[in-house]
């Protein structure tokens, strides 16, 4: 009985970890896209 309750807690922790990882991955992707946009604008601005 104790083992199943520990597994339930572990499962909840893993779901939370998975959600945190997906949020961090999305933030990383958004940050990368914003960096590319800034680089493009700076390149265009400096070549004018």
Swiss-Prot record:
Residues 10-20 have a biased composition (Basic and acidic residues). GO terms for cellular component: endoplasmic reticulum; endoplasmic reticulum membrane. The keyword Repeat does not apply. Disulfide bonds: none annotated. Residues 1-20 are annotated as: Disordered. Keywords: Endoplasmic reticulum, Membrane, Neurogenesis, Transmembrane, Transmembrane helix. GO terms for biological process: endoplasmic reticulum calcium ion homeostasis; negative regulation of neuron differentiation; neuron projection morphogenesis; positive regulation of insulin secretion involved in cellular response to glucose stimulus; regulation of cytosolic calcium ion concentration. It is a single-pass membrane protein. Highly expressed in pancreatic islets where it is enriched in the insulin-producing beta cells. Pfam families: TUNAR (PF21954). It is found in: Endoplasmic reticulum membrane; Extracellular vesicle membrane. GO terms for molecular function: ATPase binding. It comes from the Eukaryota. The chain crosses the membrane at residues 24-44. Interacts with ATPase ATP2A2/SERCA2. Interacts with ATPase ATP2A3/SERCA3; the interaction occurs at low levels in low glucose conditions and is increased by high glucose levels. In neurons, plays a role in the regulation of intracellular Ca(2+), possibly by acting as an activator of ATP2A2/SERCA2, thus increasing the efficiency with which Ca(2+) is removed from the cytoplasm. Inhibits differentiation of embryonic stem cells into neurons and inhibits neurite outgrowth, likely as a result of its role in intracellular Ca(2+) regulation. In pancreatic beta cells, lowers Ca(2+) levels in the endoplasmic reticulum and enhances glucose-stimulated insulin secretion. This is Protein TUNAR. It comes from Homo sapiens. The gene is TUNAR.
């Amino acid at each position: 009985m104790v083992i199943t309750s520990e597994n339930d807690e572990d499962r909840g922790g893993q779901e939370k970890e998975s959600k945190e990882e997906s949020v961090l991955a999305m933030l990383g992707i958004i940050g990368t896209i914003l960096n590319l946009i800034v680089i493009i604008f700076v390149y265009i601005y400096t070549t004018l």
